[in-house]
């Protein structure tokens, strides 16, 4: 099993989404976290399974929520770079992803 690491920016993305969903409806943030965890588990099981979006960065979309988990990986480690809302402009995140 590979290790998984999150950049500080990815952790901020997650925190911001959780706070936003909790403001929308009590308990919705919990649903988001469960779907996020399921997506991360799927990446851990088979990181090769998901679409290569740009360069060496892959994306796994989160079920029920309009977010994608952007990550890279090697033999030992998965690095989550970002958890972006799918409507965000590529101009906003291309710098963070090194594009």
Residue map of PLM features:
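Catalytic cores of transferase enzymes with a strong primary signal for eukaryotic protein kinases
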Residues: 9, 49, 95
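Basic/aromatic recognition patch in beta-strand/loop cores that engages polyanionic ligands
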Residues: 38, 45-78
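Generic structural signal for secondary-structure transition and capping sites
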Residues: 19, 26, 41, 45-49
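Short, hydrophobic secondary-structure boundary micro-motifs
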Residues: 30, 51-53, 92
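Arg/Lys-rich, positively charged N-terminal/basic patches that mediate binding to nucleic acids
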Residues: 1-33
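Enriched for short, Lys/Arg-rich terminal
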Residues: 72-99
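Residue-level recognition of specific faces of alpha-helices
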Residues: 8, 13, 17, 39-42, ...
């Amino acid at each position: 099993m590979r290790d998984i690491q999150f950049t500080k920016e990815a952790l901020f993305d997650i925190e911001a989404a959780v706070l936003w969903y909790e403001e929308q409806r009590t308990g919705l943030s919990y649903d988001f976290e469960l779907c996020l965890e399921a997506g991360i588990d799927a990446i851990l099981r088979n990181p090769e399974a998901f679409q290569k979006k740009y360069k060496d960065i892959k994306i796994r979309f989160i079920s029920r929520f309009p977010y994608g988990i952007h990550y890279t990986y090697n033999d030992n480690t998965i690095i989550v770079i970002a958890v972006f809302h799918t409507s965000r402009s590529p101009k906003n995140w291309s710098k963070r992803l090194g594009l």
